[in-house]
Regions:
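Membrane-interface extramembranous regions
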Residues: 2-162
Length: 162
C-alpha cells in the first residue's frame, strides 16, 4: 500500500484518489443507464410508445455524452477548467439518473404520459440500480471537488510594483 501511495504525485491526497474513483465509477454507471434505455428503446420496442420512447432515446444519447465527458482527460485543459467541465457533466448525469429514477417510480403507481409500468423485470431493476449508483458516485465526486476547491488559497492577480 505504501508503494502505491509513493507512486502518486506529492500533491495527490487520498480524497483526490477517492474523487477520481467515484468519477470513473459514476461514468460507467451513467453509461449503463444509457445502455439499459437503448436496449429498451430498440430491443423492447419502446420506440413506438409516444413520448416515453423519445425520452428513452434522449436518456441514451444524454447518458452517452456525459459519460464520455466524465471519462475524457479534460483536466489537460487546466485543473480549474477541467474540474468545471467534469462537475457540469456530473451534475448532468445526476439529473438524468434522478429524472429516470423518479419517472420509473412514478410510472409504477400511476400512468406517466399515458404509460404505466407493472412489476420489476430485469431492465427495471438494472435501471434503478444504475440510477442510484450514478447519483451516489457522482454526488460524492462533486462534493470532493467542491471541498478541494474550497480548501485552495484564492488566486490573486495583483502585480508587484517595480
Amino acid at each position: 500500500m505504501a508503494s502505491v501511495l509513493q507512486a502518486l504525485p506529492a500533491r495527490t491526497r487520498p480524497t483526490e484518489v477517492a474523487g477520481e474513483v467515484a468519477r470513473y465509477f459514476g461514468a460507467v454507471s451513467i453509461l449503463l443507464v444509457g445502455a439499459v434505455h437503448a436496449q429498451q428503446y430498440y430491443g423492447a420496442y419502446f420506440s413506438v410508445v409516444p413520448t416515453i420512447g423519445t425520452l428513452f432515446l434522449l436518456s441514451f444519447v444524454g447518458s452517452g455524452v456525459v459519460g464520455t465527458v466524465l471519462l475524457a482527460p479534460v483536466r489537460r485543459l487546466g485543473r480549474n477548467a477541467g474540474d468545471l467541465i467534469l462537475v457540469l457533466a456530473a451534475l448532468g448525469a445526476i439529473g438524468i439518473a434522478v429524472g429516470s429514477l423518479a419517472s420509473l417510480l412514478v410510472s409504477e403507481y400511476m400512468p406517466l404520459f399515458g404509460f404505466m409500468e407493472s412489476g420489476y423485470r430485469l431492465a427495471i431493476v438494472l435501471a434503478l440500480l444504475f440510477d442510484a449508483l450514478t447519483t451516489v458516485f457522482l454526488g460524492l465526486f462533486v462534493l470532493i471537488v467542491a471541498r478541494n476547491h474550497a480548501a485552495q488559497p484564492p488566486i490573486t492577480t495583483e502585480r508587484k510594483a517595480r
